[in-house]
């Protein structure tokens, strides 16, 4: 199975390829005409999966660079129809610089070396990848249950949440890990958090969860739970 790794930057896009247990730097392309170049490469190399780096701050927070990379991943998903995953790319550039110094690789290939590191991370542990969906499923909350409460919407599986705009609560926080969900909630004007360390569960009256979330993870929480209705 051929997997394409991508390190997305503001001006350049690093590419790497794997057909087995390790990856190799491939090339670096510019943003100009990247869709055509990628389409040709994907066809030529018989690519079946695409892995894109997710830039995060060192603490793990999402940033403007994160949002750009997520939007790019959605474009690639729409363009190719292939399975697309994102993985944490923190320190990939540091790794690339180290490898280049040791191997004498040209500076121009730095982004491709970073892409290879991103790809290797996915190959070592595919479960760490966030899959980018072509079509998002909808969920639903019951606004009346949340009236005048301090509410935490915890890790919704989709940003398409019917009733979220009608919630009239005392306070609303949203925690989400998935980059695509984060991007769309942010674009709707919400300010989601993506670090559990930022949460104090004792501050909330109600935590809204989906059916797959275990309740034992919420330490020091004495309030009630509401179920997010998802397909």
Where are the language model's segments positioned?
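Phosphate- and other anionic-substrate recognition elements at nucleic-acid/protein interfaces
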Residues: 2-6, 10-145, 168-205, 209-215, ...
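Conserved class I S-adenosyl-L-methionine
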Residues: 148-159
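Histidine-anchored nucleotide/phosphate-binding helix
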Residues: 158-167
